[in-house]
């Protein structure tokens, strides 16, 4: 590979590196989640469906984060009256019941990536009312959202485990969600608003993993290419110096040979004893 072709390849890789770089720092886009929720009260031997409602929220979803919190407000909604009536019918042995909020999305929730196969959104969670919130004018829902590959086949039921005098824990999918503690209490003045806290859990490990692998391979490739380029330049400089020195040596050798061929012939004088004359002889050097 010639030096010109090598430089062209290096420039092309650097340009590709610069073009791919903004993809890792782009601003998240707005996504609207429209959910249809159903409140269900779970008792040890029966299940009571409560009122349903719709919920819409504009969220800034960042695929690089696995968990996000979205807060929405539903004014003028309260199903706690019917829920309280159901709880009043419980015997004194089990003075508590659990509420499971099951939600499903109406629109497209393919917000993680085009490669994401999830087409549905199922939420599970609970109503949790603490003693300090006994006279609170709002109902508080703490809901966990999980992307599901096939929400139709997913089991959205909650199995309560009742213990007298204690909060009831819902045994849910241990892979996707964690168990939550739920307490059924009576609240007053619940006609004003309902606060929904959504903890969105996105399955983005596969997407971010491929992005990180591509990023690291690209950085490593550019780094190795830079090292090869530096080594190539060093060897080229050494080769150029060696050629210059070899050329100078050849030039001086040719000049030295030219001077030897043009040397003058020397005369040798031999003297023979006993003779009054001297013999002059000439030796010619080729």
From Swiss-Prot:
Pull the Cytoplasmic topological domain ranges from the record.
1-4, 236-286
One Gene Ontology cellular component annotation held by this UniProt entry: membrane
Record-linked Pfam families: TMEM156
Which ranges does the record mark as transmembrane?
A: 5-25, 215-235
* Membrane topology value: Multi-pass membrane protein
Residue positions with a glycan: 45, 54, 76, 142
Extracellular compartment residues? 26-214
Alphabetized, the UniProt keywords read: Glycoprotein, Membrane, Transmembrane, Transmembrane helix
Is the keyword Transmembrane helix in the record?
Answer: yes
Compartments annotated for it: namely:
Membrane
Q: Which residues form a coiled coil?
A: none
Name the UniProt record assigns to this protein: Transmembrane protein 156
Name the source organism.
Rattus norvegicus (Rat)
Q: Lineage of the native species?
A: Eukaryota, Metazoa, Chordata, Craniata, Vertebrata
